[in-house]
């Protein structure tokens, strides 16, 4: 089975307290958003303590056009992706020349040539590397990319697959959008960059713990296209997400996980480690109520959200990094995220501490 060789995340220069962001958002929205005082509690309800941003707060007080915002996305995405990759390569104790495949995940900016090409060129990675850029999966992208990386390594036991997830959510902030969705988004989303390396069976994996991939599942829920996504405007990306998301999760997630695990003669009670994309407090509550697992089974997920906010696709890799570096129970692990489509992504793992 393919194995996780290393996972790494980065911190940005601007780690800002949620209360400071709250007061800054109040100042920005107050002149044109009558409900601002009533809605400020959204910042507290998230239970987020701090968030990472690629820019100082003052940057977001000025209107930036799409051309400027996207140019900054390309520049900073490349810079921070390379930092995460270099940390991951060092942790995996491999040479960059050994990487055979690269999967690049993002939904918060555009680039052609794609960012993976820019990374390969800047780092002088193998010029024959297999490239898979993926755009548009949003919060589900991290799990989808992780599954695809493992599937590549399963198909080619000599593969050393690099997965990179870069989300600069703050650069999509529209200064003159005084909608409820934009206000709620400003209370929740943050910037995150993470990378992991998956090695095939024929390669020697030097990881301190064993996390192996068993299988994955994707599901798209019919007639839910408008639940989450972007509206593309002349000014940039306008965030769209429905208040029905927790209800959709609550209605579907138990049956989806149960059906997935049954294929491998497993039940939810057999899972020892839950590596979930947090989404937000209401999403976590929906998971807890639907799955009815004893104990604080989403502890790592909750702590990542509290410390970082929702970093879209990269968030679940932050959770994976925390589990990988700290502690977990020997046994099965389950990685889950939901995203635009509306869709779910799942991966089943076998986990053992060395």
Model-derived regions: residue spans:
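Short beta-strand segments
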Residues: 6-8, 105, 135, 160-167, ...
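Short acidic, glycine/serine/threonine-rich loops at helix termini
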Residues: 16, 113-117, 144-147, 172-178, ...
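Flexible, glycine-rich active-site loops centered on histidine and acidic residues
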Residues: 156-162, 166-188
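Phosphate/pyrophosphate-binding loops at sites that engage ATP/ADP/AMP, CoA/4′-phosphopantetheine
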Residues: 84-99, 205-206, 255-272, 291, ...
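Claisen-condensing/thiolase-fold acyl-transfer catalytic domains that form or cleave C-C bonds
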Residues: 108, 126-128, 133-154, 250, ...
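Condensing-enzyme catalytic core mediating Claisen C-C bond formation in acyl metabolism
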Residues: 1-75, 175-251, 255, 338, ...
């Amino acid at each position: 089975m393919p194995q996780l060789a290393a996972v790494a995340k980065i911190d940005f220069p601007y780690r800002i307290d949620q209360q400071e962001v709250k007061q800054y958002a109040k100042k920005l929205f107050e002149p044109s958003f009558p409900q601002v005082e009533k809605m400020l509690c959204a910042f507290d309800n998230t239970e987020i303590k701090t968030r990472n941003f690629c820019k100082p707060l003052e940057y977001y007080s000025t209107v930036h056009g799409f051309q400027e915002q996207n140019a900054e996305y390309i520049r900073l995405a490349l810079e921070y992706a390379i930092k995460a990759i270099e940390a991951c390569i060092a942790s995996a104790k491999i040479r960059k020349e050994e990487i055979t495949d690269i999967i690049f995940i993002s939904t918060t900016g555009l680039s052609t040539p794609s960012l993976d090409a820019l990374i390969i060129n800047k780092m002088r990675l193998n010029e024959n590397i297999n490239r898979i850029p993926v755009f548009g999966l949003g919060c589900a992208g991290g799990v989808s990319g992780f599954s695809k990386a493992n599937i590549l390594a399963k198909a080619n036991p000599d593969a050393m697959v690099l997965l990179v997830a870069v989300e600069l959510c703050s650069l999509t902030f529209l200064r003159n959008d005084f909608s409820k969705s934009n206000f709620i988004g400003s209370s929740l989303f943050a910037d995150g960059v993470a990378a992991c390396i998956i090695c095939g069976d024929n390669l020697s994996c030097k990881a301190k713990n064993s996390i192996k991939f068993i299988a994955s599942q994707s599901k798209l829920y019919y007639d839910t296209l408008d639940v989450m996504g972007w509206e593309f405007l002349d000014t940039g990306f306008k965030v769209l997400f429905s208040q029905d998301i927790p209800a959709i999760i609550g209605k579907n997630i138990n049956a989806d996980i149960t059906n997935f695990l049954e294929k491998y003669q497993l039940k939810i009670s057999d899972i020892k480690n839950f590596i979930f994309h947090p989404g937000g407090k209401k999403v976590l509550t929906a998971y807890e109520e639907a799955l009815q697992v004893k104990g604080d089974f989403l502890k790592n997920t909750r702590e990542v959200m509290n410390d970082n906010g929702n970093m879209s696709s990269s968030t679940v890799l932050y959770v994976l990094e925390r589990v990988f570096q700290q502690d977990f129970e020997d046994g099965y692990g389950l990685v889950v995220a939901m995203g635009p489509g509306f869709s779910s992504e799942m991966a089943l793992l076998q986990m053992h501490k060395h």
